[in-house]
Structure formats: C-alpha cells, structure tokens
Amino acid sequence: MHTLVDPFGRKIEYLRLSVTDRCDLRCFYCMPEGFSDFEEPAHWLTFDEIERLVGVMTEMGLQRVRITGGEPLVRKDVDQLAYRLKNNAGIKDLSLSTNATRLAKQAQKLRAAGVDRLNISLDTLKPERFKDITQGRLDKVLDGILTAKAEGFDPIKLNMVAMKGVNDDEISDMLDFCVEHGLTLRMIETMPMGDTGRNATDHYLDLQNVKKQLTERFNLIPTIDGTIDGGLIHGGGPARYLRVAGTNTHVGFITPISQHFCETCNRVRLSVDGTLYMCLGQEHHYPLRDLLRRGIPDDELKEALVAAIGLKPERHEFNEKPTQVIRFMSMTGG
C-alpha cells in the first residue's frame, strides 16, 4: 500500500498548494522589486491536473489542503478550484492564504465554495509603512478582513512577520486589533529565502523575547499543549499558542529560527508548475507536471509520490546554511 510517510516516520497529511507565483504586492522579504520572471501560464498545473493529483494524494493519506500563491486570488476562478477540492471526501480541511487585497470582492464566493479558514498576511496597521513594505494599499486589506469576518469565516488568522526596525514597535497594537475584531494573531520570524535585494535576516527578531513582553502586557495564558482547545486548533500548524486573558483571542508564535518545529512537520508544498518541494528550508524537490501530462496510471503516480516523499529531509538548515535556499518565497508557495 502506498502511503505518504517520510524516511523519519512523519505522516504527510497537509499540502500547501500554490496556484500562481504572481502577486499584486511586492513584500520585500518575499519577492524582489521589479521581478517579472514568472512562470508562463502554459506551465501552470490546470485545475483538472490539480484535482487529479490531490485525489491520488488523499488515497495515500492527505487530509488538508491550503491554497496559496503568490497571491492565489489573482488566478481566475480559484473559487471553482476550491469547490472541486472541497468535494473530495478525503479533504477534511480546506483553507486559503491571501494578502486580502482582493478578498472583499471574493469572500462570498470563497465561503460558498467551501473554504473553511483564511490566513491573511498583515505586517503593519500604518498606511505609509504598509506601502513601504508591500508597495500596496492598507485600506483594501482591512476592507477584505472585515468583509471576510462578516461572511462568517472563523477563525481568521493574521500572519505578521515580526521585523526588527521595521514593525516591532506595533506588535502590541496588532494584538489589540485582533482582540477588537475577534481574530487570531500569528507572529512569524523572518527566514532566509532567496536574494530579494533586501536581506530579511538583517531584521530578524527573536520571538521568544516578544512572547515574554506580550505575556506581561496582555496577561497571556498558556493553552493545553501550546495549541487551541487542547490540540483541536483549526489547522494544527507549527504555531504555539497563548490566549489573551478574558477573551477568545489567541496569539501564536512560529519560530523556525529560534525554536524550530521540524520534528512534527507534516506538510509538503506544490508549486504552480507542478514541482513538489519537501521542505521550505531545503531545495529537495520532485517534478510532477510532466508525469501528469503524460497521463500515467494512478499506481505509477503513487510510486512517484512515494519517491518524492522519500526525499524529505529531517530538518531545515536556516541557521547553518542561511544562503542555501535560492528560490523566493513567492516561488515556493507560502
């Protein structure tokens, strides 16, 4: 029987699915300014190819899919793909990561298609700072967040990349914003991903210290096993959570540098061109697009997936080899 289990006994149950490498923002830690070397649409996996691959993977143990980019909402009819994936009985959880610039117009369709949860990137609440980080408009993002909340998405997680000298002075403000609107905040350490022209590691901020400061300011309460509801957190990712006393707001800390979580990694990433990446912090990959376009039988596709998962490393090497990963975050799929 073909199963998605890596050489270290970890069950791969989670696919991060990039539907485009394009984005309508230019966050400096994700994509170089002026970058235009995107994959040609002819190289993108079609929705039919994606649906077939996900279907085969669910037979091997896949249970969760997150649609990512680039910015996934720049791809036409992504809600239709979501609907098709959600109707696969093997998929227990379907989520989407977005910068929310187009979310106000698409939230209703995504909700109707069956998307369960949203993760939204938001590094600052200051319009000018937002423009400096992303070259975009903050008001469109805030509109998208509030529209999604009104449509009933729950939970909505805000992903804030914490950066020294960039936005570390408004972490408390961001948590206040989440308390006000009933959102979950996830703090993320910067990672060395490709040469974007501005070294993200120069802005590295150890979140262990941030956690101490927020705990004192907000009276953060530990949750069972560092999760929400004792392990029943929607998504079950790498974040370790604390709860703001007297509220239902949680704040999570994703710490790939200061306290990595590789031993429990249960995910792989599929880029828009059909390349399966085993680790965000390593270059191990396996091309699947040509196999899909040759129309190989499911058994052969399963054998290829077993071979691919066999390449998954034990852990990343961000600390030991910070320049090892040459691809940009936007190419991998968030």
Spans of model-derived segments:
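Conserved, mostly hydrophobic/aromatic
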Residues: 19, 67, 274
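Short connector loops/turns at beta-strand edges and beta->alpha or beta->beta junctions
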Residues: 24, 123-124, 282
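Radical SAM/AdoMet-radical enzyme domain recognition
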Residues: 44-67, 74-188
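A short, compositionally biased micro-patch
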Residues: 20-22, 60, 113, 245, ...
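Auxiliary Fe-S-binding modules of radical SAM enzymes
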Residues: 1-14, 176, 180, 187-334
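A short acidic, helix-capping loop that chelates divalent metal ions and anchors anionic groups
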Residues: 35-40, 126-133, 194-198, 287-288
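Canonical Radical SAM [4Fe-4S] cluster-binding loop centered on the CxxxCxxC motif
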Residues: 7-47
